[in-house]
Amino acid sequence: VRRDPWLYGRGSVDDGYGGYLCATSVRLLQEAGTPHPRCTMIIETCEESGSFDLPPYLEAFTERLGNPDMVVVLDSGGPDYDHIWMTEALRGLVSGTLSVKVSHEGIHSGNSGGSIPSSFRIQRILLDRVEEASSGKVTIPEMHVEIPEEVWENAISLRDIVGDSIWEQFPTVETLRQVSETTEEMIVAMNWEPTLSVIGADGLPSVQDAGNVLRTNTDLKLSFRIPPGVDSEYAVARAKEILEQDPPYGAEVTFTPDSCADGFHAPPLDGPISEAINEASMELTGLPPLATWTGGTIPFMAMMQGKYPEAMFLCTGTSGPGNNAHGPDEKLHIPSSKRLTVALSATIAAISENL
């Protein structure tokens, strides 16, 4: 459904438009008679499931793909639609299921309460091992990195440009306060610090179906976002060790990892390429392009960086306020997508000129 300036559709901005935008940017150069380098497009459709199919294909087509000068990924965006945004860093991801079992069948809570510990209370004890409940700070040292001073400087610059819109974009209840005291602290926390989210639960009946029963088990799906530079496999191993050691009350406790992905930190773009993006942005928007970070995870970015260590990386896109990616009213911002198409054309042409 198109209702300007939006194109509505599940998967539209995250990120079904990417292949079309890339193809159109090359077509524009061909129609204008502008030389361009060889462009190879990889369209993979399991990114939301961890990109497990991608490594075998990269390996199988190593000779055909060669060593790219630049890898372009359109799965990002920024805090407004006025600028062209380039993502310099992405957080990684560690997730798994924390299971606590205390009995083989449900027991009357009046008869057992006070003698058998609740599996939910044991979950709370275990969660306190990895997160400070009052602040949300993740307490696993291996999930933290030293935050460079330039990150704080860039966060202040972003604050000055976008102001409170970063917080205001979220559909929170009116009385909710943000975790951080300042906007720049919030920007850094969203991108360069680890966070824990409980994203699912089993063993809990609905409120309507709940009875006076001490339940056998509580299972929680834990999702840790980790900053770039953290080894995700080591981090998930440490999480498992911390959560499973010395189970409270001798309960059966297991943490079963199901996904891990490293974060990403892009190397600087070459001068001519950076200049081409800047010129295109100024021509199209009247504003310079801006670098930002994304607290989310694109698993294949670190994977591609490991495969092509000498390549430049341009991670960009038109995700922004109100697009509601993964939501029922997900939508693509058409004007900024058109501008990005032209900017990408200019970038591709600049690569050809400097080969």
Which sequence ranges carry the predicted segments?
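Acidic/histidine-rich catalytic neighborhood of metal-dependent amide-processing enzymes
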Residues: W6, G11-A89, L355
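Short small-residue beta-strand/loop micro-motif enriched in glycine and branched aliphatics
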Residues: Y8, H104-G110, V207-Q208, A325-G327
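Short, solvent-exposed loop/turn segments at the edges of secondary structure
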Residues: H36, N67, A89-S95, N191-E193, ...
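An extended, acidic, His-containing surface patch that forms the Zn2+-binding/catalytic region
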Residues: D80-Y81, V138-N217, R225-R238, D246, ...
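Flexible glycine/proline-rich, aromatic-decorated loop/lid segments
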Residues: W85-K101, F313-T316
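Polar, glycine-rich mid-to-C-terminal structural blocks
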Residues: T97-S99, S103-P171
